[in-house]
C-alpha cells in the first residue's frame, strides 16, 4: 500500500508552531516574538516569488525553484499572524485608499511589529482553517482575503469575494 504525505500534516506542523510560539510571545512585553519560515502554495500548486519588487504566484520549475519566497510568520494572537518575506524584512500589508483595498509589501522588520499598535493592524492576518488548507483574512480590512489568480505569474493580492472561482484563497504550508 502506497503512503501519501497529506497536506494535513503541514497544517498540524503550522498549528504546533503557533501554539509553541504563543508561549514565547508576551502580548504586552517587548521581547521579540519567534519568527519561523514556511513554504506556502495555493491549492493549484502555485508558489510565491518576487518579480520587480512585487509578490507573484506561479509555477516555478528547474533552476527557477530557487526564486521561491518563504513566508515568514510571527504569531500575534491565537489565530492572527504577521506575514513577511526576505527574513521578515518585507511585510505583507493590507492598505485601503478610498474605495480601493490592496496588498502591498512594506519595508518593515516583522519582529518590530506589535499587536498593541493600531498602525500595525494592516500587517495582521486572521487565520481560518478549512480542513488541510488555510485562508488569511485582513484584520485591517475585514472581509478581504489573501489570494492568487487562477493564471500563473500574477500578483498575490486581496479579494472580498473568496467564493469567486477566479481567485484562489486556500493555501497549504510546510514548515522549513
Curated annotation (Swiss-Prot):
Keywords: Disulfide bond, Glycoprotein, Secreted, Signal. InterPro entries: IL-1_CS (IPR020877), IL-1_fam (IPR000975), IL-1RA/IL-36 (IPR003297), IL1/FGF (IPR008996). Glycans are attached at residue 109. It comes from the Eukaryota. One of its GO terms (molecular function) is interleukin-1 type II receptor antagonist activity. The keyword Transmembrane does not apply. This is Interleukin-1 receptor antagonist protein. It comes from Canis lupus familiaris (Dog).
Amino acid at each position: 500500500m502506497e503512503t501519501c504525505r497529506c497536506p494535513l500534516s503541514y497544517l498540524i506542523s503550522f498549528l504546533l508552531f503557533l501554539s509553541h510560539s504563543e508561549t514565547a510571545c508576551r502580548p504586552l512585553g517587548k521581547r521579540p516574538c519567534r519568527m519561523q519560515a514556511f513554504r506556502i502554495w495555493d491549492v493549484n500548486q502555485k508558489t510565491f516569488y518576487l518579480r520587480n519588487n512585487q509578490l507573484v504566484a506561479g509555477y516555478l520549475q528547474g533552476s527557477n525553484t530557487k526564486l521561491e519566497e518563504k513566508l515568514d510568520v510571527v504569531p500575534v494572537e491565537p489565530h492572527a499572524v504577521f506575514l513577511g518575506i526576505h527574513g521578515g524584512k518585507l511585510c505583507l500589508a493590507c492598505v485601503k485608499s478610498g474605495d480601493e483595498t490592496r496588498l502591498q509589501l512594506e519595508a518593515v522588520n516583522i519582529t518590530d511589529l506589535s499587536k498593541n499598535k493600531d498602525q500595525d493592524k494592516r500587517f495582521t492576518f486572521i487565520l481560518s482553517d478549512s480542513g488541510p488548507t488555510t485562508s488569511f483574512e485582513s484584520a485591517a480590512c475585514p472581509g478581504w482575503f489573501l489570494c492568487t489568480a487562477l493564471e500563473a505569474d500574477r500578483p498575490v493580492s486581496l479579494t472580498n469575494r473568496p467564493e469567486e472561482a477566479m481567485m484562489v484563497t486556500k493555501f497549504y504550508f510546510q514548515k522549513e
